[in-house]
């Protein structure tokens, strides 16, 4: 089972 998709990296 695949978990939730990775969240996009938000630059600081």
UniProtKB/Swiss-Prot annotation:
GO terms under biological process: regulation of blood pressure
Annotated compartments: Secreted
Modified residues (Pyrrolidone carboxylic acid): 1
Key words of the record: Hypotensive agent, Metalloenzyme inhibitor, Metalloprotease inhibitor, Protease inhibitor, Pyrrolidone carboxylic acid, Secreted, Toxin
Organism domain of life: Eukaryota
Gene Ontology CC: extracellular region
GO molecular function annotation: peptidase inhibitor activity; toxin activity
Tissues of expression: Expressed by the venom gland.
Function: Bradykinin-potentiating peptides both inhibits the activity of the angiotensin-converting enzyme (ACE) and enhances the action of bradykinin by inhibiting the peptidases that inactivate it. It acts as an indirect hypotensive agent.
Family of this protein: Belongs to the bradykinin-potentiating peptide family.
Protein's name in the database: Bradykinin-potentiating peptide 12b
Species of the source: Bothrops jararaca
């Amino acid at each position: 089972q695949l978990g939730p998709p990775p969240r996009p990296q938000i630059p600081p």
